[in-house]
A protein has these predicted regions:
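Conserved Rossmann-fold NAD(P)-dependent oxidoreductase catalytic core, especially the SDR/UDP-sugar
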Residues: 1-52
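A structural motif corresponding to the C-terminal end of an alpha-helix
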Residues: 2-13, 56-70, 236
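Conserved beta-loop-beta element that borders a ligand/cofactor-binding pocket
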Residues: 19, 59-88
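Short catalytic/ligand-binding loop motif for oxyanion handling, primarily in non-cytosolic enzymes
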Residues: 23-27, 81-83, 156-158
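Residue-level signal for the nucleotide or nucleotide-sugar donor/cofactor binding architecture
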Residues: 51, 55, 121-124, 155, ...
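Glycine/proline-rich active-site loop of Rossmann-fold NAD(P)-dependent oxidoreductases
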Residues: 67, 81-97, 127, 135-147, ...
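A conserved pocket-lining segment of Rossmann-fold NAD(P)-dependent short-chain dehydrogenase/reductase
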Residues: 79, 95-127, 148
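Mid/C-terminal beta-alpha module of Rossmann-like enzyme folds, strongest
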Residues: 130-217, 221, 229-231, 235, ...
């Protein structure tokens, strides 16, 4: 184990573990069947499911006791940021979806559940997550504690879908009232994206290196509201917040600047 090797040398001072809200939700197959209700708080009782997040936290705490280093656990929601080739990347997936919808004329429709469309949710900006990691590593009040790590605002996808569409230069389609999974919509995505990439001089012609349809379907298709409470972080001294609209819009701007998605006239 890496921490056994490093811990035995005595040079480890702090270890940060990043997990996520499946600590409260359980595995994908358990969504909607557990007693967890938002807002999720760090002290909630663990679910009666085997969860590798629980195992990771327990191993970390045990090794910290053994070798004398400090630790922190960070539980983000869906992370929005610039990361290509990532298997769990909603922001880039939606950007690719928007470009394909604009190219083909298909409707840019929210693909998830009614509960996610009309309910309350949140996200985590990768930049805020990085700041929370740095804060916890250097703050005595964060020693050996678990913290939620979300932007600090909440929204409904009914409202955010209009923001996302505007940021991608595409019209939002009316929501039909039921899920329309991207894995079903995007069966022809590969040749369409390659055509766009070659014509526009984009850096990545392989759509599977950019879009994770299944993961975005899993996030947006949850049959319940999903958001976390940040009180514990605030009380411990982490004040940062992030406008979730800017999380998406800043990402789209960078994707265009890096020639990952096409330039468009943004509404």
């Amino acid at each position: 184990h890496t921490l056994d090797a490093a811990g035995a040398v005595g040079t480890v001072e702090h270890v940060a573990l990043v997990t996520g809200l499946k600590y409260y939700l359980g595995p994908f197959e358990a969504y909607g069947r557990n007693p967890a209700r938002p807002p999720f708080r760090e002290g909630q009782t663990r679910l009666a499911y085997r969860n590798f997040y629980y195992d990771q936290e327990d191993i970390l705490a045990a090794l910290a006791d053994k070798y004398g280093f400090r630790w922190s656990v960070h539980r983000p929601h869906t992370v929005i940021g610039y990361a290509l080739g990532n298997a769990m990347n909603m922001g880039v997936t939606l950007a690719v979806y928007g470009a394909i919808a604009r190219e083909t004329g298909r409707p840019f429709v929210f693909p998830g559940s009614p509960q996610q469309y009309d309910g309350t949710t949140d996200i985590t900006d990768a930049r805020l997550l990085a700041r929370s990691l740095a804060w916890a590593a250097t703050s005595p009040s964060a020693t050996n504690e678990a913290f939620n790590a979300v932007n600090g605002d909440t929204f409904s996808w009914r409202d955010m879908w209009e923001v996302v569409a505007a940021g991608l230069g595409v019209e939002p389609a009316p929501y039909p009232g039921y899920p329309t999974p991207l894995v079903e919509q995007m069966t022809d995505a590969a040749p369409t994206w390659r055509r766009i990439a070659e014509r526009e001089g984009l850096t990545e012609p392989d759509v599977d290196r950019l879009a994770s349809w299944w993961h975005t379907d899993g996030d947006l298709g949850r049959p319940m509201e999903t958001y976390a409470d940040m009180t514990k972080s605030r009380e411990a001294g982490f004040p940062d917040v992030q406008d979730s609209r800017r999380s998406f819009l800043d990402l789209f701007d960078r994707l265009r600047a890096e020639r990952v998605i096409p330039e468009v006239k943004v509404r």
